[in-house]
Amino acid sequence: MKEIKSIEFKNEVLYLIDQRKLPNSYEIFECKTYRDVNFAIKEMVVRGAPAIGAAAAYGVVLAAKEFLKEDREIFFEKIEEALEVIANSRPTAVNLMWAVKRMKKVIEKNKELELIDIYQALKKEADSIYLEDIETNKKMAKFGNEVIKENAVILTHCNTGALATVGYGTALGVIREAHYSGKNIFVYADETRPRLQGSKLTAWELVQEGIPAKLIADSVAATLIRDGKIDVILVGADRIALNGDTANKIGTFMLSVIAKVYNVPFYVVAPTSTIDFEIESGKEIIIEERSPEEVTHINGVRIAPEGIEVYNPAFDVTPHENITGIITEKGIIKPPYKENILKLK
């Protein structure tokens, strides 16, 4: 199949697959300013921690391009404002701040150069983030494939594929690797309410690649696990604390609890850029709350009565004791997590 590119930057425009429109329509969303990128991240045109990080980096490039004709002092003021706007697009995914910090360091390091040279340096750094993500995902996939047995039945949650990254994917990247290495795997994909990333995105990627799979309602997962029909669970991550506590799409924690009860291996697949070395535990992770309409409506159609209140956290935190291992591009991290995570710093 044709390679899925969730992000592409060419001719000073950032092109994104509009993930709000999948699977029924394949449309490209064009970002010509950093404000467009801010909108795309907030409104989930682009989603998935690694993809958000790469998009944010190119957002800084677009900001630099926009302000090139300003006086130096104004240029740096405007860039600082743009960095702030982009950094605050969404609060939970650490890759967003990681990418913004990398771009900020480039500005600080090259502050004495001509503005056009600063722009070129920013473009080079964004390209590096983009290319690194692809390489990182392929390394993770190879390490992750080690935990996948022949004929394994895998359960996954949300979308962790090429759409959630620059390419290939994190947890879904491991699934791809196992499939292409001939392991005869089968996948159950949670639909992932309320945004339905499992049914709209993961199922779409699995169909595109010809990977044997079934889509299930989130509430079916516990029955499959109890009945011994799941060999391993693979999920992604939006932020990992020093002790291994992991913020991921809402519903991940629930899966980890059931997996622990029935002794099913539960792996997090994420690049080391998703580890937040500045927080000790998941208690410090800010959990984004999103619009009530995501729960009360599906595709614009109201499914709940007027007047009902809604609680809609986008993520939950899975405690480290429920996690079998964290698969990264540097290998598989096992408990004790803090001790082993610090070795990666």
UniProtKB/Swiss-Prot annotation:
Q: Cross-referenced InterPro entries, in alphabetical order?
A: IF-2B-related, IF-M1Pi, IF_2B-like_C, Initiation_fac_2B_a/b/d, M1Pi_N, NagB/RpiA_transferase-like
Record field: transmembrane = none
Q: Which Gene3D superfamilies match?
A: translation initiation factor eif-2b, domain 1, Translation initiation factor eif-2b, domain 2
Q: Name one GO biological process term.
A: L-methionine salvage from methylthioadenosine
One of the Pfam families matching this protein, by short name: IF-2B
Give the pathway annotation: Amino-acid biosynthesis; L-methionine biosynthesis via salvage pathway; L-methionine from S-methyl-5-thio-alpha-D-ribose 1-phosphate: step 1/6
Q: Which UniProt keywords apply?
A: Amino-acid biosynthesis, Isomerase, Methionine biosynthesis
Active site location: 238 (proton donor)
For this protein, what reaction is catalysed? 5-(methylsulfanyl)-alpha-D-ribose 1-phosphate = 5-(methylsulfanyl)-D-ribulose 1-phosphate
Q: Where does substrate bind?
A: 47-49, 90, 197, 248-249
According to its UniProt record, this protein's enzyme class is isomerase
Q: Give GO terms: molecular function aspect only.
A: S-methyl-5-thioribose-1-phosphate isomerase activity
What residues does the record give for site: Transition state stabilizer? 158
Give the matching SUPFAM superfamilies.
NagB/RpiA/CoA transferase-like (SSF100950)
Q: What is its EC number?
A: 5.3.1.23
Which HAMAP family does the UniProt entry name for this protein?
Salvage_MtnA
Task: Report the sequence similarity comment from the record.
Answer: Belongs to the eIF-2B alpha/beta/delta subunits family. MtnA subfamily.
Instruction: State the function annotated in the UniProt record.
Output: Catalyzes the interconversion of methylthioribose-1-phosphate (MTR-1-P) into methylthioribulose-1-phosphate (MTRu-1-P).
Official protein name in the record? Methylthioribose-1-phosphate isomerase
**Naturally occurring in which organism (per UniProt):** Thermoanaerobacter pseudethanolicus (strain ATCC 33223 / 39E) (Clostridium thermohydrosulfuricum)
